[in-house]
Regions:
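Bacterial N-terminal signal peptides that target proteins for export
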Residues: 2-16
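Class I SAM-dependent transferase core
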Residues: 26-67
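Conserved class I S-adenosyl-L-methionine
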Residues: 69-78
Length: 203
């Protein structure tokens, strides 16, 4: 999911859609919609749907350094490709949160066809209402404004050692512990950030 809390040109969004629709077998009929929330976190709709290319999904999961027993939450899970990939490749439980009922239905069908119903769950839920404590890995493709609003919640809810992975956008003054920059197969520059939840300071 690609959230927008700031303005972005329509041409940029359409370019992103055209170059990122590379996952064979995934529904591509959903067109991006720019919701006019203008940074309003109370808006029901935060993000238009733009697929994350499979090669970027792979790099995001690699940067997460997933281990046995991890639980992955994907915010704005769209067509479900991140949660499906996590379950397939690493055998972990993965939960996608998506507010669009059509995408929820489609991604649940993909999960069923992949035989991953025991590992993958798609919840029709607003990401602002998610309780993150069960997760050890959180992935997102949201705009900086949404990232910044989620930051204190993630830092509050997640256990020490949990990883937060963001495609393209950072979290302000919260410095990532790792950053991966690369060119994808369409020669577009990609950046993936990782933050690790630190142990609370000793008193």
């Amino acid at each position: 999911m690609f959230g927008t809390a700031h303005k972005i040109s329509t041409s940029t969004i359409w370019l992103a859609v055209l170059v990122s629709a590379v996952g064979l077998g995934w529904p591509e009929r959903h067109q991006p919609v720019l919701y006019a929330d203008d940074g309003d976190w109370d808006s029901r709709h935060i993000a238009p749907f733009v697929t994350t290319p499979d090669e970027v999904v792979t790099r995001m999961l690699e940067l997460a350094e997933i281990e046995k027993g991890d639980v992955l939450y994907d915010l704005g899970s769209g067509d479900g490709r991140i949660v499906v990939a996590a379950a397939k490749r690493y055998g972990i439980k993965a939960v996608g949160f998506e507010i669009d009922p059509v995408l929820v239905k489609d991604s649940r069908e993909i999960v069923k066809q992949a035989g991953l119903e025991r590992l993958v769950e798609i919840r029709e839920q607003d990401i602002r209402t998610v309780y993150f404590s069960p997760a050890t890995v959180v992935t997102m493709y949201l705009y900086p404004g949404a990232n910044l609003r989620l930051r204190p919640v993630l830092m509050r809810d997640l256990k020490p050692g949990s990883r937060v992975i963001s495609h393209d956008f950072g979290m302000g003054s919260w410095k990532p512990d790792r950053v991966a920059r690369f060119k994808d197969s369409a020669d577009l520059s990609r950046t993936i950030y990782r933050w690790r939840i630190a142990e609370p300071p000793r008193r």
